[in-house]
């Protein structure tokens, strides 16, 4: 099954990032200074699995998906997200202000805008909510945990997070939502 057609990024638009990176980096410093031990644990859990909180929610509620289904969505989203990161070419907050206390990460090696984790976690949240609409509010909240955690980690500006959510919403609109099992038989 293919979730996204090739070239989809040409049909999606995003607003440019704000111009004041230094001002927004100051916001990030305040957010980072107020992160809790619980935030740090969540950030670590989401580093290589942007949908970690969503997966945990699905497990708790018995919402079953096929092995590899979420991973395939994430994998197919990468070229679209990368297109926008290359286009906007925004430096990460720590590149603007070296005093930001970032956490360790294996996944913060690309440009900042939009946040890929925010886009991917919103996309997965919407995908699951499309199948289980009664859980949409909780799924969006779980997705936001993964996305906003990247701001709390010092990896992204708040505007990166907002644009990532917007990109995730737009990608969901265009995504193939056919039954995964039937498509893979």
PLM region descriptions:
Residues 117-121, 156-185:
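Alpha-helical transmembrane segments that form the membrane-embedded catalytic/substrate-binding core
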């Amino acid at each position: 099954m293919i979730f996204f057609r090739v070239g989809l990024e040409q049909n999606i638009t995003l607003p440019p990032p704000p111009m004041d990176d230094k001002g927004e980096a100051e916001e990030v410093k305040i957010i980072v200074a107020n992160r809790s031990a619980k935030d740090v644990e969540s950030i670590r859990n989401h580093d290589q699995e942007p949908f970690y909180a969503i997966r945990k929610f699905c497990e708790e509620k018995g919402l079953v998906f096929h092995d590899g289904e979420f991973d395939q969505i994430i994998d197919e989203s990468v070229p679209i997200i990368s297109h926008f990161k290359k286009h906007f070419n925004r430096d990460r907050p720590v590149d603007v202000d070296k005093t930001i206390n970032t956490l360790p990460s294996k996944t913060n090696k690309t440009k900042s805008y939009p946040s890929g984790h925010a886009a991917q976690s919103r996309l997965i949240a919407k995908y699951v909510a499309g199948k289980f609409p009664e859980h949409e509010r909780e799924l969006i909240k779980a997705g936001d945990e993964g996305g906003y955690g990247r701001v709390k980690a010092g990896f992204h500006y708040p505007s990166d997070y907002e644009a990532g959510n917007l990109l995730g919403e737009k990608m969901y609109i265009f995504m193939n939502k056919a039954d995964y099992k039937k498509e893979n038989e």
